[in-house]
UniProtKB/Swiss-Prot annotation:
Cofactor annotation comment: Binds 1 zinc ion per subunit.
Sequence motif: 'HIGH' region, positions: 58-68
The organism of origin for this protein: Legionella pneumophila (strain Lens)
Compartment list: Cytoplasm
Protein name, entry field: Isoleucine--tRNA ligase
Coiled coil spans: none
Binding site for Zn(2+): 894, 897, 914, 917
Lineage: Bacteria, Pseudomonadati, Pseudomonadota, Gammaproteobacteria, Legionellales
Annotated gene: ileS
Amino acid sequence: MAEYKDTLNLPNTSFPMKASLSVREPEMLADWQAKGIYQKIRKARVGSKRFILHDGPPYANGHLHCGHALNKILKDIIIKSKTFSGFDAPFVPGWDCHGLPIELNVEKKVGKAGSKISPREFRAKCREYAASQIDIQRDEFQRLGVLGDWYNPYVTMDYHYEANIVRALGLMIKNGHLQQGFKPVHWCIDCGSALAEAEVDYEDKTSPSIDVAFSAVNPSEFLNCFGNQLAVKPLILPIWTTTPWTLPANEAVCLHPEIDYALIDADNSYYIVATDLVESVMARYGISHYKTSGSAKGRVFEHFKLQHPFYKRQVPVVLAEHVTTESGTGSVHTAPAHGPDDYLVGQFYQLPLINPVMANGCFAENVELFAGISVLKANETILAVLSERNVLLASESIRHSYPHCWRHKSPMIFLATPQWFISMDKSNLRQAIINEIDKVNWVPDWGKARISNMVENRPDWCISRQRSWGTPMPLFVHKTTRELHPDTLELIEKVAVMIEKSGIDAWFDLDSSELLGDDAKHYDKITDTMDVWLDSGISHYSVLKHNNDLDFPADVYFEGSDQHRGWFNSSLTTAVAMYGVAPYKTVLTHGYTVDAEGKKLSKSKGNYVALDKLVNQHGADILRLWVASTDYRHEVSISEEIIKRNADAYRRIRNTARFLLANLFDFNPASDCIDAKELLELDRWALKRCQLLQEEIITAYDNYHFHLIYQKIHNFCAVDMGSFYLDLIKDRQYTTAKDSIARRSCQTAMYHMVKAFTIWLAPILSFTAEEIWQTIPGNNSESIFIEHWYDAWPTIDAVNMEDWEQLHIVRDEVNKALEETRQRGEIGSALAAEVTVYADAKALPKLTRLGEELRFLFITSEAKACPISQSPKGLAVTDCGVSIQVTASAHEKCARCWHRREDVGQNQEHPELCLRCVGNISGYHEERLYI
């Protein structure tokens, strides 16, 4: 038997089947860095319209986790896709560097500032630590294939950035938004500092749930409000609270003006309780025999006096809208020093603002009964005092959501302390922000309602902190009037210049007389630092407005859903406070990373997926494919099994690219591309399909629907290519003459397709796309990322896509019939079969038009199409209106193409070949029109 293998055009490529991503990716990353690919991308887009995605700065502390990877990869996909669309899309990464987590890590090593180490030395250690963390995270982000200006990032501890934070504060002062006040703020005892809303986590906590009797000083004035002649006896207004430790600061009891309150006659006392709560309250007190003796609105009791339950002072009844009947008694214990609602009520009624609790969380020494006791341990003592005085009506434990410090995970308290605030209402800032929210595109759209609700309900923003490592508030306050220095704005700019030169130590080391001269003796120098959310929040000012390569406002901010209360909020608030407009046009939000069951990832739960392990084991491109495969608008599941599924999808994509490349091994696009008019119809269909798909993919990129791109590309590889086009072209590609029109037509199509396909992949599978790009024949650009979306398509005459869709459907039905025949043992491969398709009037012309090439559609040795009317009796009709008859071929098998043909053996020189193969190896170019 002659050997004909060498007469075939068998595929050949240096592009390996095994990806070995964990080895190749670092090599490619080093090559990108050595060649300065990011800088070359920027140079290639000079003068183009800009697209600015502004990076929300991660905190410079610790190694990256899967949530970081999700965020940065999503951003990278956007930046790269916009670059392919022709935009100048720079990416300037950032890091958030001040604040408590860094302080805590430094404290573990050197102790607290002011004890074992000076504050100045402590700040230097914090700066050093943050810089080391940036180096770690920079390498880890780059390992993910994220391109950006990594060695020119914005860093909130850079001197020029710190100076701009100070300048931003000055601009907000100029616009009338800063005020000082003695207000209740979230206070972390462990931090020893106020915290912002964004630094508060709500977790379940067990607390005492108690009802306390406040007795009427003059029961008669209460009873008279019910309009009946009632016997005078003790009258109680009971309150319900889960924070007994706040009772020493009680200054009032609050009712709702429009709620109906019932007068309950029980035993030897009256009780006034919200009508809707009477039954539950009486049950809680164990009182089964009682009667309702009247009803009145809460407003009628305003200013009546009650006796404090354990102090010799009287407190008034006051009114407010925040009182509800969802729980409790309808009467709310009010301590202006320990809650925002209480504070506002206290301001309205001019109640005393007395704070009995010190910064360390203990009652002050002058607090009667509880001096020196920690508020976190005081509840038991307070309950004992209440019980001793017979004013504890009910007591139990309750599990409820309670604010905790985001860093220490410890319960927080509301504490009235002297702080600095951005007023939400003083200069109509709240309404201005709400107006700007309406102008922003929120994706998903529920983000608008979420941030609107937060802005509408947020208290004034406490921006001062009592910390060592942070940007200072460079303010001087008059010792007597407590007013800011009249030259505050000029002084702030002077300090900003100093910080720009020497960093924040310039303020902390400053002697007031250096700026104020003789005035210094009249002013206190403020030592507070600023909220880190203000640091990152003014990046629109320090970065977008001060970097000539960027624009304000940004086109996109893109972060996790928790940033509606964090960076989205602080950025919006500061931008509107500074110059009246939102800092972004579109806000995209992604969900949290969770496990396969939707549970939070946790090392203690054993479901934590380590990012470095994933990258080292599978490669960054598998992780990038996972990101693209998810609908990021919801929670994003990750597990080893999910990653393995993505690895399977990756292999299909890689194998598709490898097949295309392997069949271009002898193709020179400069000389071997054929004219579009000579392309076979199947190749024209494939090119048209790619062009249409590219339009869909670009639209999906523009709409940030990356999971749809994943689905489209996977379907393209599996269906359009794998089970159809690439299957059909094998015979033509391998068996026809090397330089034949039939073969070059296929190669021309594959060349255009692989170039387009690779660019589609590049925003997602960045390393793999670059590897493919460098293997494509021809003179290609140095990096795929300098390219645009593919636009060098040949001009394709009209292709009837519906006809080919019908042929595809019929082929699928034929494959089913072939498989059934194979299962019965009647044939081996499809080439051992001959097929007759009986088709209806709609399908028949589409099949008969292919003539002798119909067999190449089914990859059988013979095929013909006949009218459905000629179908043998009993032959089933498929859903697409055809009947299929499969028979085993009786002819000999060609040793070269493996088709079983009647003419095998008719050529004496090549007795093992069919005449088609004889012609192909003898220099005769087989002619094809369709397949």
